Amino acid sequence: MATITDVARVAGVSKNTVSRYLNERGYMSEKTKSAIQDAIDLLHYQPNQIARSLTTKRTNFVGLVIPDVVQPFFATMASRIEDELDRRGYKMILCDTMHSPAKERKYLDMLTANKVDGIIVGSHSVDIDYSGIGLPIISLDRSLADDIPVVHADHVQGGHIAAEAFLKHGCKKVVQFVGYSKVLSPSAQRHKVFAEQMRDHGVECFTYELRLNQFEFSSYLQTAKMFLDQYPGVDGIFAADLVALAVQREALSRGRRIPDDLFVFGYDGSFVHKIAYPPLPTVIQPYEEMAATIVDLLERRIAGQTPEFHSYVIPVVSSESVPDEADGDPVGNYDLTVAPR
């Protein structure tokens, strides 16, 4: 296995010069940089990350804590965040808590013990003092503490978009499905706005709360069956994409026409709405913009800077306003300016 001494010998420079190159310290000519990199490539040299971290006080590892990697929203966000971290030279440690408070605590202890550079938290398992962890933290769609920045989609706008769709369709009796959560999440804003808009326009609106830790598609199908048995007169459903898909599938199996008899509108804009038939209209969350904002804020905190705002809110769009060629790439062709709040 090649050592730093071997690299220095092949490159014709000192060990100290190679060390400065690896740790990006001090001025160095492009010719010297090129010679060192050529030697590294030739020898397949791998720097000792432990020794390097002792010198730089950095590990270039970032932890991402999420409640369920199978859920389309979190799966998509994890992918986008990993891409963004990789582009900036970080490696991501994915921590899937499976909605377990005990696992969440264990993962946080592990990340802290391994001195990761920072943590991105999107888990909704337990309400603990994240401010006391002592590492740079950015929150994904969850209110953790006043001194921890949170990045989320504009759920108020999302609630309005969904409400307008139901009013336009002429629905008279609608139900929105709400996920159970022990902690405060900005995503709850969409449900509040949606219910207010429905009632302001004389539309009956009921809220159906999903059971704690109900996240499997099979359980959503069972819920859809029970729900349609209990509320046969409902003509509109508002839910996260995966839940909406389950309700739509069960309704179709009963001979309900979609959207004529039952108007189903989703929320998330993950791949789910594209595989649904009939097509599932939905509110598309800006995954790439959120990922870029989260990583940018985390880098600032790692550098010792204090972000200007506590909340960073990014606009959403309706799938019905997105051209087919942009479908599945929610923000690629849109100017979605980050709006601090």
What are these regions (language model features)?
Residues 108, 116-122, 175-178, 231-242, ...:
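Periplasmic-binding protein-like
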Residues 1-59, 333, 337-341:
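N-terminal helix-turn-helix DNA-binding module of bacterial transcription factors
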Residues 225-226, 230-238, 242-341:
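Flexible loop/turn connectors
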Residues 173, 205-207, 258-263:
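Short acidic capping loops at alpha-helix termini that bridge into adjacent secondary structure
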Residues 67-76, 94-103, 151-161, 177-225, ...:
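Hinge/beta->alpha junction and helix N-cap segments in small-molecule ligand-binding domains
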Residues 2, 60-164, 227-229, 233:
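Alpha-helical recognition/docking segments in bacterial nutrient-uptake
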Residues 17-20, 54-69, 173-180:
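Short beta-strand segments enriched in small/hydrophobic residues
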